[in-house]
A protein has these predicted regions:
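A Zn2+-metalloprotease active-site environment signal
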Residues: 2-263
Length: 263
């Protein structure tokens, strides 16, 4: 009896995972910028429309830097990179937010936000181009669409598994479904996110070079970021969506050397 129940549990879980796999296989496409196959169930255009509202709300709610020279600097570097990114037709916008956060972000559709806190780390425009190039790299890499698609595919499989578990009255159905969810998060979704971060670094370095900036300054910037983070508690890489600074610097340096970039 126990063996039969265990086999039923396994079949139920496998059925849910199989459903997610069918969705995943149906949506796989090759990204021409990277040569990597991606799960793309939604388009960048659809996400751009959804993100437009978020961008407008952010501009209305967040305080922005009013120093015209700072705004011109960020917008100038950003537009120069965007023009050489292969995505020049996209309606790019660049905003500088008045916050101590050491961060920057990009929304689908070419909306880039840079925080005042991170500007203090830049020694030159090449390092500013490192960050903006990285954000543009996420767009060129179709990472937002891929991330959403991964979540859709994972949720399809999880939903089927949860329903089947409940209908078959499997013992500890809620606990098993919860564990399955954690497994998908740490085993599938987060590693892809780290892959996207490394990919955005590489694409960003290429965009920097195309825009006339020194790609070697990407390594210098992350060295400075490491020093800034020295007093902060960092999560273990396995539990994080971002590569650790040390691994990031090593990967960037290897790529810059491999590409033979010079100032």
């Amino acid at each position: 009896m126990a063996l039969a129940s265990e086999l039923m549990d396994r079949r139920t879980l496998l059925a849910g995972l199989a459903s997610g796999c069918v969705v995943a296989l149906a949506g796989c496409q090759t990204n021409p910028s990277t040569g990597r196959q991606q799960l793309l169930l939604v388009s960048e255009g659809d996400l751009a429309q959804l993100s437009a509202t978020t961008w407008r709300q952010t501009l209305e709610q967040e305080r922005r830097v009013t120093d015209a020279a700072v705004v011109r600097r960020v917008s100038g570097v950003g537009q120069k990179l965007a023009d050489r990114s292969g995505l020049a037709r996209m309606p790019w916008e660049f905003a500088v937010f008045d916050s101590d956060q050491i961060n920057a972000f990009v929304l689908p559709g070419g909306k880039v936000g840079v925080y005042r806190g991170i500007l203090n780390l830049f020694e030159n425009d090449d390092q500013l181009a490192t960050v903006i190039g990285h954000e543009i790299g996420h767009v060129r890499g179709r990472h937002a669409a891929e991330r959403v698609s991964q979540q859709i595919a994972a949720q399809v499989g999880l939903t089927v598994a949860q329903v089947a578990l409940q209908q078959n009255e499997v013992r500890y159905a809620r606990e098993i479904a919860g564990a399955l969810g954690a497994g998908v998060t740490f085993g599938v979704i987060l590693p892809f996110s780290r892959t996207q971060e490394y990919e955005a670094d590489r694409l960003g370095v290429d965009i920097m070079a195309a825009g006339g900036y020194d790609p070697r300054q990407a390594v210098a910037f992350w060295d400075r970021m490491t020093q800034a983070n020295a007093q902060r508690r960092q999560p273990l890489e396995f539990m994080s969506t971002h590569p650790s600074d040390g691994n990031r610097i090593a990967a960037l340096n290897q790529y810059v050397v491999q590409r033979g970039y010079r100032a």
